[in-house]
């Protein structure tokens, strides 16, 4: 038996959010919440009873402590996080946006210690004592050394027989489409379950067509066991060893949007860890809706809430 069900690594961040009705350049208050795509996935799975670990490199100080408290508090093993005596935390600022203005993200994550990681930073014997390694394109995008570390982790996990989950999660503010393809495409023959939206499939991997077409072509071209593709509000598509399936997306009121995609990935991986990705997508659709109901990148929930009916009634 492995020590973990899922391990992952990424940059620990702090999100600073402008209150609705204000702009970053003129606001007087900001809401502070810990953030990080990989940590969000590990945190959601930990709340569902999975054994998860997250690795990173963070400085000493209150902001790093705030991050650690958030994810340790929901059960994520943070013993593989490297604490450094100096350095800074990665930040990002968000304006939620109100029509006709879109939401806007401003990154402030240059010169962090995490950007300096190499394959030698982490103890892979410990981190790869797991059923699944989860990696994202966000971490690969930061620097050449983080891309090298993601590549090493995937190759070493594959060599050891560990299943690999990859979320392309393309961010145009972090790297170009060409560089994303250069780094990520060579990893795909080692990946078991791929999360790639229709738009990411088009931009990064050269696909074309509607959601079902892109989803099916990704699975066929790269010979993946499972491909899960979101297409904004149009739906979710699955192709893989469980066949092909389309899932509708139910629009819900939004309190806070960041983290909902990570919550979907985490819910889907909960099913994958039980050998049922289709059931997992159902969980993911549920958890991503719950993510939109409260502030913060990390979705807070209990296992019972996976089955709770969607309602505005009071549960008494």
PLM regions: where:
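Short, conserved phosphate/pyrophosphate- and ester-handling motifs at nucleotide-, phospho-/glycolipid
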Residues: 45, 197, 261
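Structural alpha-helical scaffold elements that stabilize or flank donor/cofactor-binding regions
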Residues: 125-126, 186-187, 220
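Conserved phosphate-binding/catalytic region of the ribokinase-like
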Residues: 1-7, 155-156, 207-316
